[in-house]
């Protein structure tokens, strides 16, 4: 694993990581082209061609757009950020950002707790995103084509675009080099 934009603080024990993003950290390419940044701390690795990554994401939702995410990155203009984020209304939201030069930001389900489970699966050039409240029953959020000819990196991100910092806990982490068979069932 390697850092892209090192975290303000980081610790890891057993199957848990805590990552702290400093102020004004984000990864976004605004459709209005007024805000383009990629300074959020990311802990990344090179995944297999086909894989399933699962992790629970938990944080305190202190400031607008504070978030923790699973990230799949091809380069600075092509990436997916699957984020558990405090949205513009103050809600805790499942958010997926697919960037192919410009970010396509999709605000999905509102979550009532500070913790949710995420799953990102890759099968060839198809990426599927899921969430779960308990890590057992998975709900499909997004199913898309993503050009994956170049070397990809996969990992974890913390962000605090408007706040002073955001401390994110990633736990229940599971990585399998496996091709998903049924995108609707998540296995």
List PLM regions with ranges.
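Extracellular glycan-recognition regions
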Residues: 1-187
């Amino acid at each position: 694993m390697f850092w892209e934009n090192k975290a303000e603080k980081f610790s890891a024990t057993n199957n848990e990581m805590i990552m702290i993003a400093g102020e004004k950290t984000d990864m976004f390419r605004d459709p209005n082209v007024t805000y383009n940044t990629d300074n959020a701390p990311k802990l990344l690795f090179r995944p297999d061609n086909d894989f399933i990554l699962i992790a629970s994401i938990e944080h305190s939702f202190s400031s607008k757009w504070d978030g923790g995410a699973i990230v799949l990155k091809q380069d600075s203009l092509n990436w997916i950020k699957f984020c558990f984020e405090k949205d513009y209304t103050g809600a805790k939201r499942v958010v997926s950002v697919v960037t192919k030069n410009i970010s396509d930001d999709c605000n999905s389900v509102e979550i009532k707790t500070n913790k949710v489970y995420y799953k990102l699966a890759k099968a060839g050039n198809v990426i599927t995103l899921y969430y779960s409240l308990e890590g057992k029953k998975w709900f499909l959020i997004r199913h898309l084509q993503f050009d994956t000819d170049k070397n990809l990196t996969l990992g974890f991100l913390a962000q605090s675009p408007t706040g002073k910092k955001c401390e994110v806990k990633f736990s229940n982490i599971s990585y399998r080099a496996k091709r998903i068979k049924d995108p609707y069932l998540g296995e």
